[in-house]
Amino acid sequence: MSHDPLSDHKRLIREVASIAGLQVVEPAERREWPQEMAQEAFIGLPGDFVRLIDPHTEADPVALLGNFLVGVGVLFGREAYAVADGRKHYPVEFLLAVGDTGSGRKGTATGRVMPVLEAVEDNLASRVLSGLSSGEGLIKGISPTEEETALPDEVRRFLALLPEFASLLNVMKREGNTLSAILREAWDGTRLRVLTRKEPLDVDNVNLSVIAHVTPEELLNNLTATDRCNGFANRFLVMLVRRSKLLPEGGGDVNISPIVGRLHTAVEAAKGRGLVERDKLARALWADEYERLTRSREGLRGALCGRAEAHVLRLSLLYALLDSANEIRPEHLQAACAFWDYCERSVEHIFGGASGDTDGEKILNALASGPLAITDFYRLFGNHRDREWIQAKMAAMVRTGKVVATVKAGDRKESVAAWSLKGTVRE
């Protein structure tokens, strides 16, 4: 039998990971794809749109559905809303489509939805944003012109298309960049402000929907611990997408007029709607689902799925508005739950068992090469961590049982205090 060095390498990685208490996560494309989105999500007008377009495109049906639901939120503006704990939730959502470059067909799905939206609202193209780089720039881009300031109560409705989401993540890493904070405020529906400048920027009544694209590798490599834990990432519906079929001759044109007509009717019906509540049966269903949606989740999954109930509320509102319904009915809530459940499975698939503690993971990976002393940690973190932080962090990791205190030869060959992975040295 021939020797397989690759198998030896994989076995070594798993042994080290076992010692460190880590889970080895296979690349996304090698792991089984998440269970498909339940058919309950494909109801009403959005479901009919997907069924109309799907035979003629390589885009993933879930990507078509996600783009449609998030995109139409721009058309509804603030004419209708739902309420949770005294807070208004408008039909605004952020979608993050995660798929491989090219074969993920992320842009293809967006390209199929935009003609429908633009057919319903002629001037929508003028309110599509791209290339966001700062909170200040975003506010300037959506602020009313001098001619428009005479209408202070007018809702500013915009759609941000971000096909290079990784670039946005990198921009947000710059010191003093306010884009993350402003996007979070936009999702919340609050006034957008940047006050730390001579001429403060301020705009209110903004409905901003976001459709972004990224590859799994870009997301894993560029989403910082801050983005994961400060509520930025969990404001997005994270959705794994892939090519649904091969169409060597390309997808053909589709008559979207019936969809456009029905969507126009739904938008008109929503005008002046105001508060949209769940009907009696939907309230009973919500009571059953609420505990599941708000349950505590561990690690990174918990950080990225921390707004499950808010997403389901907004999605159910969108489904109801697209049905021209006066109330959120059980089928709207079931559709929203089915959509969200796929997003949560996508997060689990992409991030696996990651803990969300990037510093801790960095330390464990470094300790796999041998014991480390204080000076080694200085180098590991580029002198951005002081002695007090290192000692506190290592004490916490010792308490987890994954790391033990030991000694090693210092830079001048003297014995110095150090730490190692449990089981790799004599304690």
Regions found by a protein language model. Name each.
Residues 2-427:
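Phosphate-handling catalytic cores of nucleic-acid transaction enzymes
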